[in-house]
Amino acid sequence: MEKPILKVENLSKIYHTAKAEVIAVSNFTYEFVKGNFIAIVGPSGCGKSTILNILANLDSASNGKIKFEDNIKIGYMLQQDALFDWLTVMDNCLLGLKLQKNLNEQTKEYVVNLLNTYGLGDFINSYPNVLSGGMRQRVG
């Protein structure tokens, strides 16, 4: 078996409210291997988003260990997209590259190819308000 790019051991998240202690995640353990497709499924409120938020460093765990392979980058699409309505589809896609100072002709071409692959090529110069919900998520 390949070396995992991400190891999660006994991850737990407990929320404290005025009335009670809520266990959102209890002892989640998993080894993520490069190239594998993973689906975290379950009923509403079972901790799926909490796990993803912790892995994306948007929230902290109450307990457990998370070990990333060196130089790994994690991408995560939230349920609600975060597109800027005043930017075109292309400009929304290029924004992260601009902020990281990684924008060049090669990366622009790569983004155009991705947009074409995901059926968004005809919307490169469109604004998010004309996109369906699914299209907005693909742009995100």
Predicted regions span which residues?
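Conserved ABC ATPase signature
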Residues: 127-131, 135-136
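Conserved ABC transporter NBD signature motif
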Residues: 63-74
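Short coil-to-helix segment of the ABC ATPase nucleotide-binding domain corresponding to the Q-loop/switch region
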Residues: 87-94
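Helix-to-loop junction immediately C-terminal to a conserved catalytic motif
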Residues: 56
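ABC ATPase nucleotide-binding domain "signature" region
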Residues: 39, 139-140
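Conserved ABC ATPase "signature" region
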Residues: 73, 94, 105-123
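The feature captures the beta-strand-to-loop junction immediately N-terminal to the Walker
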Residues: 41-43
